[in-house]
Amino acid sequence: MSSLYASVSAIATTAASSAGGASARDLGIAGGVSGFAIIVLLMGGLGHRSEMVTTLTWFERFSERVSGQPAWASLPCGLAIISLLTAVFGLYWDVSLHVDRGRDPGVFSNPSHIFILAGLYGIFAAGWFSICLSREERADRPGPTAIRITRDWYAPLGGLMMCGAGLFSLLGFPLDDFWHRLFGQDVTLWGPTHLMLIGGAAMTLVGIAIIQVEVRRAVRSSGLPDREYGWVRHLRHVWLPGGLLVGMSTFQGEFDWGVPQFQLIYHPMLIMLAAGVTLVAARVWLGPGRALGAVAFFIAMRGILALLVHDSLGQSLPHFPLYIAEALIVEGVAFVVAVKRPLLFGAVCGALIGTVGLAAEWGWTHVWMPIPWPREMLAETIVFGLAMAVAASLIGAWMGSRLGSERIPHSIPLRWAAVASSVAVAAMLAFPLFTQSGTDLSARVALRTVDAGPKRTAIATVTLSPRNGADHAKWLTATAWQGGGLITDRLRRVSEGVYETTRPVPLYGDWKTMIRLHKGNAILGLPIYAPADPAIPLPGVAAPPRFDRPFFSDHELLQREARTQAAWITWGAYLTVLVCTLGLLAMLAWGIHRIGVTAGRRRLPHPGVAGPPPPREPEPEPDPEFDTSLPEPVWPAHFPTYAGR
């Protein structure tokens, strides 16, 4: 543990050495390792199909024995789970490091990046293995949803989607470095390329869900007995929707640490979006109790991540919502409205999630969130929260009905409701992006020193001009970060227009200390102290005992490293990320739709042939005296295997 703390301290001392892209050395190492790993992966998969490489055979049989599923589903899903856990741990550690220490000089200077890269590569590898492990000569080969690659090679739909989502995330890494070179290092979770990394990994769960539907159908239509262990099935029904809930909650990270750089209304909107999509889909697709199981898995995973990042690694604590009320609502509605009427079920769930569930999350923010939702935001929270919950629940009902389409009738109105809801969600997420930049607000700050030593701290008294400048504000905080920790202190009102910190704030070293104000659609900041940064370059901000300063856009304070480019470069960069994102979303929608419309189709006895496959000529019996082949392994009866079918 001491060596781990030493490595983190080393990051802190070298963090300011770069404010653009990674060094040529880091790029060379990353490119070489990634290229070599991709080549090995592709050659290994193709070699396994041609039976020239047998390395995967042991893993193939092992995954079948422990799960009871065919290897083209069990091995990729197991690898994807491990990879997602690795990536999400790296993500939360990485965000905490940036909040506490600031930017890093390169890819390999931050140990959390290794976990993220390994996890994303594992996701891509899982999808590729699923594509390569499906064999047409097996009775349990993928069914009619499979995508034809060659005459006798059909890839599982879920495997292709996992591979695509992993590739989308991996593409975010080189684009992120390119973005830093153009616009500086964006120390925010919601940087465009950062969202690519998060979004691709989170949406991998959709590919896993589809491949699980495919394997159930394939085993059923093959006439083979279902040998999936009961504990595997029950665990899958918990971790799959729970994992999707964890993935969708990562987008709320701007608010989990208490340093949001976007409007606070996003927080309830994103919570309602995750609850509506995930919990409604889980109940419609998987049956009773699955929404509660998903929330239990979510709380366990996020709790473990919080303990690892905060208690074990000594970084800032990431907070999270509960979703318990929303899960109870979904399970309760199912007693009144049949899930076989998904349109009505989704609408009722959305209405209750957007009212009762929203009220529960409102209360939870006042218990365990760094920035609670104030009553000044009540009206817009009700409007946007309710609208988002209904739209998300209709999308979740559509997803659940597609994944469980063998027992839930198709609904054309539900399909169009989901399309309209998707457009509404996009519009609602885009609306709060626009913020007010100009302001005439200023403040006089008086600092009462608490510790006058080299680690100077002080109580700040802030007098606003005009005095009503913070009336109806959504937050008014003193924030100090990137100096070895994080402080988010909600100011105490002393009198009209006069506010005071409730604890001393740091005014030394690498700390960046400021007053932050969010009122209406304006997010403003006033610097109190900041060190000089020659890498950008920017001069330091001194903290005399008394001073007057204006407020301005707090993006200039929180993203000191950011720089502007010509308009065509900026629009071109954003358009590139947008096209990639729309491609991922289109792939997900197409995959979910395809798994639904093929539910009633029967698989042909042999792909591409309208009748039974041609009979094979009998192979000659081997001569026992000259037979040098290895005997087939004999597994215990309780370890079923699909190998050789």
Where are these regions (language model features)?
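Membrane-interface helix-loop-helix junctions at boundaries between adjacent transmembrane segments
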Residues: 107, 145-162, 170-238, 253-259
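Membrane-interface interhelical loops and short amphipathic "cap" helices
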Residues: 2-26, 92-114, 175-195, 223-225, ...
